[in-house]
Amino acid sequence: LIKQTLTKYRNQLIMQQQRTFYNNILPLNTEEHKDLRLKIDNNFSIFSNTNALPIAGVEFIEASREHAIAFINYQDEGVIPVYILGLRDNENLLLDDNNNWKYRYVPAFVRRYPYIMVEPDKDGKSVVCIDADYEGINDPKGELIFTQKDGETKPTPQLEAAMDMLKDFNAQLTRTREFTKRLEEYDLLKEISPQINLADGREFSIGGIYTIDEEKLLKLEDEKALTLYRSGEMAWIYNHLASISNLIRLAEHLPADAKGTPKKTKAVKKKKVAKKVA
């Protein structure tokens, strides 16, 4: 049995919160970057060694249809929801051989790259930045991110759309933090260690993740339940709960050489697919 604890999930997420995906963060301004071109592609190789990413509550309904959403807890940040990408350390099973996203829904954390909005400056304004090491920067086939209009340098529609997305994502992350604080206040989280059994006898167990305790949820005081309902967070909760069974979908994409401990029972000769999550 391979015990895949999520200790490294936590470490990776702390690093991600510190923007380590962005190797060279460059604040954008109209003076220096008025001629900058950017070509956006669907190569997400920068996320290939990542097994979980932060996700906003508003994304739960779309993300839960395809893959698992869980919660993790680490000392400085508290509880946050994560989109599980792999069952082993440094593994993203949602990318194909060309580092394109395999599935319909791409998390906002991924979609925003190479842009990022950093903390407010001394004037209280958030600053839009870009990863200066992104391969698509200054590509001749790329689009200008600024344009001249009425004698002024202004964002192009491409950059405006990115800025709107960043503002919305940051706002949703703030709302999600309020949601997770409420879960902790209501004592609705419990730690789980789901076990995934493959038909060929390999087993994988995940530790260090949290889910909503449905038994406690059903016993919640009416006033608290109404707060969750009217805020829309009750829908988030049930989307999360439904998503946990999607760990099987991840297991079906494990490479054939992913090591596990075979069961002592005879091997199943059928197609090697995941058969259950205990």
Which residues does each predicted region cover?
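Aromatic- and glycine-enriched beta-alpha-beta binding-site module
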Residues: 80-148
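Short, basic/low-complexity N-terminal boundary segments at the transition from targeting/disordered tails
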Residues: 45-49, 88-99, 172-180
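A contiguous, surface-oriented mixed alpha/beta subdomain in the mid-to-C-terminal portion of proteins
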Residues: 117-278
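Short solvent-exposed loop/turn micro-motifs enriched in small/polar/acidic residues
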Residues: 62, 109, 187-190
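Short, extreme N-terminal leader segments that mark the start of a protein/domain
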Residues: 14-85
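N-terminal amphipathic/basic-hydrophobic helices that include classical n-h-c signal peptides
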Residues: 1-18
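Detector for glycine-centered tight turns/loop "hinges" at secondary-structure junctions
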Residues: 76-77, 99, 201
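Short, glycine-/Ser/Thr-/acidic-enriched flexible segments
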Residues: 75-76, 110, 211
